[in-house]
């Protein structure tokens, strides 16, 4: 599979909807300019994620005619959580498709299940000092089991601004309610790697939300970093159906491969497990474009 030209052709058209870029507090493999130099001619587009800062300014700063890059923002504490003013400013700055991730490292769910704000497996450096989760105030989007008024108002705002919602590291129950609300508003939604151990959304709920119009993310990093068996990933994709699944890399860690290499490895593994090229094309090219509102 090392020189599978069909896979390479698909990845040249693919959009990786989940790539971690630096500079960031978490050590990252590439800055935007380094990413472009590495990936030009190898991948169609990349949505850039950063747990602490919006990535649209990173994109604007570099000259680039090689890869289509899309901005992203994560609603963690460093950006004020569910911050409407920040989103309005970001949309004024960047008129292109933008991914809005709900809280990740500062979600109540993640902080309850992780000793540290930044998971050690993301860094693999004993000298890196992460804050203890117990010392961090979570970004809450629920009160008494219901979405807060501010969250509902925020959802209406990002729908009006034509932004795509990703569920981040919310609990699966929170993700279910949030994504249903945004779908009902007519918005575009992707469930952020619901197979992740700290989310662990039941496949029944994934199918329920896919039927409503949500996309389901399956990331290479869940296999390469979080050690989720490929058999489980395959089972979940087949259960939901390729028409509702998007493959991503979710890499950018210092020790991880480049996004194009990660997607190549992912595709090679999936081909060995019964998938075909048309299905890979659907999950890497067509579905990401629909998610971002490009088609």
Give short role names for the model-derived ranges:
Residues 4, 262-295:
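Mid-to-C-terminal alpha-helical segments outside catalytic/metal-binding sites
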Residues 8, 40, 58-67, 89-96, ...:
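Acidic (Asp/Glu)-rich catalytic clusters
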Residues 13-16, 45, 68-70, 97-101, ...:
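Structural preference for beta-strand elements that scaffold enzyme active sites
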Residues 67, 80-192:
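Extended substrate/RNA-proximal surfaces in nucleic-acid metabolism proteins
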Residues 76-83, 166-170, 193-200, 219-231:
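Active-site glycine- and acidic-residue-rich loops that bind
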